[in-house]
Amino acid sequence: MEAILGIILSAILTENFILVKFYGICPFMGVSKKIDTALGMGMAVTFVMALASAACYAVNLLLGETYAYMQTVVFILVIASIVQVVEMFLKKSVPSLYQALGIYLPLITTNCAVLGAALVNAQAGDGFRAGFLPSVLFGVAGGLGFTLAIVLFASVRIRVDK
């Protein structure tokens, strides 16, 4: 239980992808003009990070030590596939959010925060936070940290613009 709480708190606060590592700054700056759009982007990134952490865990097991040099390229391909599925889902289910996110939705593919979560998981301990569940949990918590930062920044931005 302590380990799970540690993963959650570290991913949201002490290893926050935006506030600490400065990953994912482009969509952070571009989408943080309205709170609802920022929240939608944060939730999309959280969803992609969770799925990418799970998928990259499985891919990392398949790659093994022999093809470790291919890790980054394969992770980018996996993330791009996941983003395409999320984009199709949002276009059909929530067209208003799809329109609001605009170009920033496909840019989740190249969002350093998503790739960073997969790579941090792969390098932590015995690889992928020493298990499937901790790596997915880190992805979800990292996405929630991203969401927290982007929503807070949108709130401050709205307040300053008034």
Question: Could you say what each language-model-derived stretch is?
Answer:
Residues M1-L5, A58-M70, A118-V136:
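Helix-coil boundary and interhelical linker segments in multi-pass alpha-helical membrane proteins
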Residues A3-I18, T66-I79, V136-A149:
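Structural signature of hydrophobic alpha-helical transmembrane segments
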Residues F22-G30, E87-S93, Y104-L105, C112-R129:
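Generic transmembrane alpha-helix signature in multi-pass membrane proteins
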Residues F22-T37, V83-L97, F153-K162:
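C-terminal ends of transmembrane helices
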Residues D36-F47, Y69-F75, L97-T109:
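Cytoplasmic-side transmembrane-helix entry/capping segments in multi-pass membrane proteins
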Residues M43-N60, T110-L115:
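A generic, lipid-embedded transmembrane alpha helix
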Residues N60-M70, K91-G102, D161-K162:
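Membrane interface segments of multi-pass transport proteins and intramembrane proteases
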Residues R129-K162:
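C-terminal transmembrane helix-loop-helix hairpin of multi-pass membrane proteins
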